[in-house]
Design a protein with these regions (language model features):
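S-adenosyl-L-methionine
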Residues: 135-183, 187-191
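Conserved class I S-adenosyl-L-methionine
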Residues: 102-115, 133
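Mobile active-site "lid"/loop adjacent to the S-adenosyl-L-methionine
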Residues: 183-230
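Conserved alpha-helix/loop element of class I SAM-dependent methyltransferases that forms part
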Residues: 57-62, 80-108
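Conserved Class I SAM-dependent methyltransferase catalytic core
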Residues: 47, 213-263
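Local beta-strand N-terminus motif with an aromatic residue
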Residues: 106, 177-178, 246
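Conserved SAM-binding loop of SAM-dependent methyltransferases across substrates and taxa
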Residues: 116-130
C-alpha cells in the first residue's frame, strides 16, 4: 500500500485501507469491494452505500466503535481527512501545553455541526481520550448522533442549536469551558450553488446528472448564507463573546482562497 504523505504522520490511514482487515471486522463491506486496474482491492467511491460501509468498517476496526450508521442522504465524511483535523488540533493544543500533546477527558472539545455521523467526537475520543460536546442545528442529525452514542455506550454530550444566526450562544453555558472548538462549515452560499456543485462533480466523473445519484448532505450541511467564508467570519465575530471560555477557536475551510477574505 502506498503511503499517503499528505496525511498527518500520526494518521492511522497513511498507508491506505487494509481491506482484508476491514472485512474481518465488518463483513458487510465485502459485497461492495472490487479491484482497480492495478489489481488492488477498493470500492466504488461514487457509491454512497459503499462509502457508508467503508466508514463503518474503518470506525469499527480503528476506533473501537461497535455500531455506526447514518440516515439516508446525510453527509458521509471520509474518515482519513476528518481524523487529520483531530491530529492537527492535538498539535495546536500542544503549543499551549509545553509542546506535549494533551490526552484524557480533562481536555474539553466543542464540535460545531457535529452531524449525523458524529465523526469528530468518535475519532477524537479514541485517539486522545478528549471529552466532546457535539452541537447541531438539525434535529435528525442530533437524533442520529445520540443513537450512535447509546449503541456504543459513549458519554458524548449533544446539544441542539435552535437559532441559525447563533454559533456559540445558546449552546455554550455560562459555566462551560473548552480547550478547543472545531467546525467543518457548510461550503456553499446557496441551495442552487450546492446543487450545481453536485452536478459538476457528476459531470467530471462522466456520469451525467441523476436524481438518484448524489454526494449526500442536507441543506444545513451543504450551504448557509455567505458559504464557508460567511460562516467562518460570523464565527470569528461571535467568538469574541466567549473568549474567556475557550482557549482555541478553530475552523476547517475547504479552499485556500477562502483564507484571504478572513485575514
Amino acid at each position: 500500500m502506498a503511503v499517503k504523505l499528505m496525511l498527518h504522520p500520526r494518521n492511522q490511514h497513511r498507508e491506505g485501507y487494509d481491506f482484508e482487515r476491514l472485512v474481518v471486522k465488518s463483513p458487510e463491506l465485502e459485497a461492495f469491494m472490487t479491484r482497480n486496474p492495478r489489481g488492488q482491492m477498493t470500492i466504488n467511491f461514487q457509491d454512497a452505500d459503499a462509502v457508508r460501509m467503508l466508514n463503518r468498517a474503518l470506525l469499527m476496526t480503528h476506533y473501537e466503535i461497535d455500531f455506526w450508521d447514518i440516515p439516508a442522504s446525510y453527509l458521509c465524511p471520509p474518515i482519513p481527512g476528518r481524523v487529520d483535523y483531530i491530529h492537527y488540533l492535538a498539535d495546536l493544543l500542544a503549543k499551549s501545553n509545553g509542546q506535549e500533546i494533551p490526552h484524557g477527558s480533562d481536555i474539553k472539545a466543542l464540535d460545531i455541526g457535529t452531524g449525523a455521523s458524529l465523526v469528530y467526537p468518535l475519532t477524537g475520543r479514541h485517539e486522545y481520550g478528549w471529552d466532546f460536546t457535539g452541537v447541531d442545528i438539525d434535529p435528525v442529525s442530533i437524533k442520529s448522533a445520540r443513537h450512535i452514542c447509546e449503541r456504543n455506550g459513549l458519554n458524548i454530550r449533544l446539544k441542539r442549536q435552535n437559532n441559525a444566526e447563533d454559533i456559540f450562544e445558546g449552546v455554550v453555558g455560562s459555566d462551560d469551558v473548552f480547550h478547543v472548538t472545531l467546525c467543518n462549515p457548510p461550503f456553499h452560499a446557496s441551495l442552487a450553488q450546492a446543487q450545481e456543485g453536485t452536478q459538476r462533480k457528476w459531470r467530471n466523473l462522466g456520469k451525467g446528472h441523476s436524481a438518484e445519484l448524489n454526494f449526500g448532505g442536507q441543506n444545513a450541511e451543504l450551504w448557509c448564507p455567505g458559504g464557508e467564508i460567511g460562516f467562518t467570519a460570523r464565527m470569528i465575530e461571535q467568538s469574541k463573546n466567549f473568549s474567556e471560555q475557550c482557549l482555541w477557536f478553530t475552523c476547517l475551510v475547504s479552499k485556500k482562497d477562502s483564507l484571504k477574505p478572513l485575514s
